[in-house]
């Protein structure tokens, strides 16, 4: 009986597998699946710009707007001539091609069918893209590559597509501990992540900026009518927070998650550690770590991200293509080796306004990896 196979590079196979890479990213990606929205009025920490799906270009321009500041016109006072100029700021996120090639081996090694090789290739490519997107978005929001040893890009990495990392400004950076630390250089091993730091971030988010100040006011993401900030912490910061609170205190935080989140918030609160004062606490393995803090520049630390709306932007897509990602199969060495290439066009950037971060606080704390091994 003749064997039924799907020919390599067939249109049906390419469309199916390129679409599946995008679906996997949306379902399993940390930022993509939970904290991303598009449109003119995004309501999530990551704003996805869809312009690349409609037109070509090496950059996408986006706009940020501040609150109105002027006084109203009262009584019979003439209103004409008192119009207030909208306080908007535009910025560019540059985009570039991003591709990854995987070799499926040579014909001597191929004991599987072509369909099986596509399945394996798709799974590995999806895992890779999910990891790359998660690491990249976290680096941009953190404004640094950090010293994480398990990242795809090495520690000399400074960004993709001409979009450089932007370090946190002094208005949007806070430090752990009792409040004595005023910089990463003055952090000590005792300045760990705790609820006091979260309380400070909540208070600052509610009081800083807006109105007549030209400082962006952090806006809480709104999920089903409920405003909830997002705090993304590193696993070691989670460990320190649990130790600080003890079983009783931690039970109260997890109880708030169980009783305070409804089904419509499932993506936003899915896998959360808890809810504290309407802040959803999430842990992310790709949280940025450092090993050069403290007075001696040897203190290990981690940067948590306290996020509001439009903390960062992601431009993603391929104009004129049905799928976000491309999928190309090619035989090399006279039909001896099969290679599969997945690619897209993208750009990532932290949103800033006049040199100030727009929607994120950096919460820097000591975070000693040896504390979880001893």
Regions flagged by a language model, labelled:
Residues 57, 95-97, 226, 335:
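Short, solvent-exposed loop/turn segments at the edges of secondary structure
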